[in-house]
UniProtKB/Swiss-Prot annotation:
The gene is Fam120c. Keywords: Methylation. Residues 35-53, 966-976 have a biased composition (Low complexity). Residues 532-544 have a biased composition (Polar residues). Belongs to the constitutive coactivator of PPAR-gamma family. The modification Omega-N-methylarginine is found at residues 57, 972. This is Constitutive coactivator of PPAR-gamma-like protein 2. It comes from Mus musculus (Mouse).
Amino acid sequence: MGVQGFQEFLEKRCPGAVVPVDLLKLARTVSRQQQQQHLHRQLPPAALAPGAPRITRGSAPLPPPPLPPAAFGAYSGGAGPSRHHHPAHHFHHHGQAPPGLHPPPPPPLPGARVLVDAGSALPRLYGGYQTDWVCGGQWNAMLGYLSALCQACAYPGGDGLELVVMFPGGLGKDRLAEWGRRCQAERQTAQLIVGHVGNKGTPPPRAWFLPPACLSHCVRLALIRFRVKVFQSLEDHHLEVVAFFRENGFHGLLAHDSEYALYNIPSYYSSHALKLSWNGKNLTTNQFLMQEVAKQLGLKRMNFPIFAALLGNHILPDEDLAAFHWSLLGPEHPLASLKVRAHQLVLPPCDVVIKAVSEYVSSIKDPSNLDVVGKDVFKQSQSRTEDKIERFKKAVEYYSVTTKLSSLPVGPSFLGFRNNRLGNPPLPRNQMGPISPGKPMFSRQVPQKMKYPPPFPMGPNSSLLFSHSVGESHAFSEDAMLQDNSFANWAVSYDSNTSQFPNCLTSKTSPPLGPDSSHSSSSDGDEANGAGSEQITEAVQQQPGWEDPNGDRGAWGQPADAGVSETTVAESEPHIPSLLSMSTRNHMDITIPPLPPVAPEVLRVAEHRHRRGLMYPYIYHVLTKGEIKIPVCIEDECNMELPPAALLFRSARQYVYGVLFSLAETQRKMERLAIRRRLPMEVPSVILKEWSAYKGKSPQTPELVSALTFREWTCPNLKKLWLGKAVEDKNRRMRAFLACMKSDTPSMLNPANVPTHLLLMCCVLRYMVQWPGGRILHRHELDTFLAQAVSTQLYEPDQLQELKIEKLDARGIQLAALFMSGVDTALFANDACGQPVPWEHCCPWIYFDGKLFQSKLIKAGRERVSLVELCDGQADLASKVEKMRQSILEGVNMNHPPPSALLPSPTFVPPMVPSLYPVSLYSRAMGSFPPPPQARSRGFAGLHPIPPQGGKLEIAGMVVGQWAGSRSSRSRGSFGMQVVSVGGPGKGHGKEQAGRGSKGHKKGNKQGSSDVISKAVELHQSRARSQVNGNNGTLIVEEKSDPLPAPSQCALSRDSNECNNSDDHCLPVKNGEKNHVPEQELEAVAQQKEE
C-alpha cells in the first residue's frame, strides 16, 4: 500500500526531515527542565522580589533537596524499570518521622516517557537483525540485550527514560487483506531461507529476516521480568496506540510504521534505527520532523488525512486508486506505458505516487468538501463509484481522528472500537450492580470496562493474577494508588455506536452476535460458564444454524459483506484491467454459529489480563469472537516428512477451545437434562475460525475447527478453573494443561524425572512425538533437545556468540521452528487453563537456544557422538536426559502405522450447506489424531441407530432372521454384519463377522424370525426405559475394530476419581469394550417361540 511506503520515502527522499537523536540525552534534558519548573513554582514570593537571586538560562539551578534512593526515577536498583513504585509508598515509609525535624521529601518528578510499539519494533527488541535468528532464536542473547536496554534507561539521579511497550493484541479484521499479503510474502521468504540454508549451509541475508516463532510472547515475558510496563491493544492497534499516547502524555513514540507518521505524533522516532552503545551510555535513533516533511511536500498538516486516504490504505486499497494514480501521471510520463500491460493490474512506483498525490492535495481548493473531492478523484471510474467515494470519506475520517484533536477524551471513545461482541453502547458505571443468580447480565449491553489497578507484583512464585477472584477488593478496587496512576484511565469503554466516528472500523464481515447469543449466566460456581441447564436448553432450541445473527443469511460461496452484483463485476474500465471493477476485499469470511455464553466475571478477567499484557492475546478474542490468527514460521513446503505447524498443533488448540467454552460440563448438563426429560438431545458443536497460511492453504479464507473435550475426565467450567482457590482447583488446572498437550501421565509431574522448569518443554516434545502421520523426532533429535536444555552453555550467551557452526542443518532449522511453535501453543494452553505453570517456567531462555541446538544436533546426527559426549562429558546430565526421555516416551507407541489415504482438508464450509466430510475430520488433513466423536448421546440404552451393514439373529447357532441396513456401505471396505447370537457359541454376546456373512444358513423361517426380532427388541426397549443409562439393560453391539491402547494413568488420579463420584459420564465407552447382553431374556423369548 502507498501508506506503508511512506516511511521509506521519508528516509530516502526527505533527508532534512530525518535527524539523529540520543534518547537518553533528551530524557536528561526533559528531567532538568521539569526540575527547574518545579523549583520555580515552589519559590516563595520573597525570592522573586527585586534583587533576589534568580535562575536564568545558563546558570546552575538551585540544588534540589536530597531524594531517597527509592525515588530515583521510574527505575530502581539497576534491575530494570520498576512497575510498582509510587509516591504513596515513600510517604508511608517516611511518615513516622516527628514533625518539624525533617519535612516530607517531595515526590519524584516524572521523567521522560517513551511509548514503544512492539508490533513494528520486535526486530530491535529481539536485539537486532543478527543472523542467528534462523536457528529458532537465541533467547538468552535477547534477554541480555533487553537487560542492557533497561539498565541504560535507568539513569541514576532520576534522569532516566521510562519505556512503556504496547503489544498488538487485536484480530485486525479490517486489515485481513493486508495480513494475507504479508503472510504470502513471509511464506515466500521462508522458502528462500530454507533453500539458502540447504544449498549453502550459511545463515540467510539480513533482508530475509523472519521473526522466530513465539517472538512476541518471548519479548513480552522478558519485559515483564524486567518490570517494564506492558500493555496490549484490543481491536485497532494503531488507533489504540495513538489514544494511549495522547491520554498519558508521552514524550515520544518509538515505532516503524508509516501510519504513525501521518497521525500527527509530536515526537516520532524510528525503532528501525535504534542503536544501543556497548557501554550503555547512548541510545540513538532517528526522529522524523513532520513539519519539515509537510514543507518539502508542499502540504499543510491539516491536509494529511486526505493525503493518507489517497495514497492507498486498508480502507481504500491501491486497486481502487490505480486509475486515479495513473491519471495524475498523465500520458506524457515516462512510466505511462506500464499501465497498458495486457490483463494485468500494474501500479505506479510508490515514490512517484507520493509526489503526485501531494501535488494534487495541495491544489485542492476546499479540502473540507469531501464529496466534491471524491467525485473528482473517481471521475474516471466506471464501476462502484459511490462505494469508492464512501470508502474515501471513511479513510479521511479514520486519519482525521488523531490529527484534528490535540488529546483524546476519556470516556466513551469516538474511535469506534468494537470492544464487545454485541456492538451496543456500554452500561454507565453507576448502573453496574452485583451479579444476581440467574439474571442475564449481557442480554443487550456489556458493562463498562473497569479501571486498571497499578501493576501487580511479579515475585519469583507469582502466578499472574490467577489466585484471586474478580470480586475481591484488592484486585479491582480503585484505591489511592490507582487515582494517581498515569495509566489508570487506560480502560475506558469504547463505543462502536457513537456519532463522532461512525463505525468506519467495523465491517459486516464479522457481525456482532445478536441478542439470541448474548451472555446470560448466573453466579453459581457449579454451572458451566455460569449458564444453567434450563438456559442451555433454550439456547439450543433457539439457536440458528449457519445463519447471520443479524438476519442476513450468507450465500454458499459469498461472504456476508460482499455486496457486488454480477452486473457490477462484469463491467470493466477501458484502460485499466478488469481487476479494478471487482471487489477489492480479497478475503472470504464465513459466519459461524453463535458461541456459547460466557460468564461476565470470566470476560472481565479476560479483558483485564489482556489489556495488561498478562495473557495470551487471542484468548479474549476466542471467547468473544471465536477467531484466531496463526503466524507463519519457517517451513519447507517441499519436505513431506514434517507437517505444517498450524496442523501439527491444531488438536491441542481444539482442546483449548473446549476448555475455554466449558464444553465438557455443557455436555454433561445436556445429558442430565436429556435423561430427566427422556428425550434424545444432541449437544451443538462449538465452531471456531482459524486464519492461517501454509502449503495448500490460502490466508484469504479461514478454516472451521470444532472444539474438543477430553475423553478421560470432565474438565470444570472456566470460571472455576480460573478463579478457584482450592487445592483441587490447582490440580485441575495442571491436569487440564497436561491433557491439552497430551501429556497427562504421572511421570511428567515427578520432579525426579522432569525438572519443574523443563515441564513445558517436555510437554511440547511429547506432543510432537505422538504425531500419528509419521515420525517427527528421531531418537538423536529428541536427545539433542533435552541435552541442550540441561547444558551449562545455555546461560552463557557470550560463549554462544563465539560458537562457530560450519554448516547449518536445514532439518534442524525446521525442527526448531516447529518446537517454538509448540511453545507458543503451550503458552496459549497454559493461560487458558489458569496458568498452572508459573510464567517464570514458561520462558524459553531457560530451556532452549537455537544456536546451541544446531551445534549439538550436528554432533548427534553427523558425528554420531554418544549421549555422554552430547552432554559435554557429564554423566549426571546424561542421566537427567535419559529420565526425561523415558517420561516423554511413556505409553507412546513409536511404531507409527503408515498414514492411510486421508481426506483432503476443505478450505471452508459454506454456510447453510452441509460438508461432505464431518467437521471432526477437518484436523486430519495431515494424519492427525482423529478427535473423539462430539455430541454423543450416551443417555438412552437401546436407542441405537440401525447399523448400516445390516445384521442377522442366530439362535443356538442357527440363523433365524436377517435384516437390511439403514444405508449401503458404498463400497468403503468390508464392514462386518451385525450378529445377535442367543445361546450356542456366542453365549448371548453381540458379535460381528467379517464380510457379508457366512454362505451357509441362508434359509430360515422369515415369519418366525421377524416375530422373534420384534419381541426381543420390544422387551429390550422396555427394559432400557426402566433402567435409563443403566448397566444391565444396555445392548451394545461389538464392532470389529483395532483396539485402542490402554490409557495410561493420569498425572492427577485423585481428580479423576473425584470427577466420577456423581455420575458415570466422565469416561466414555471406547470401541472394543463389551457390555453383556441379558441372555436370559433373549433365550426365554426364543424358547417360547420354539414351543
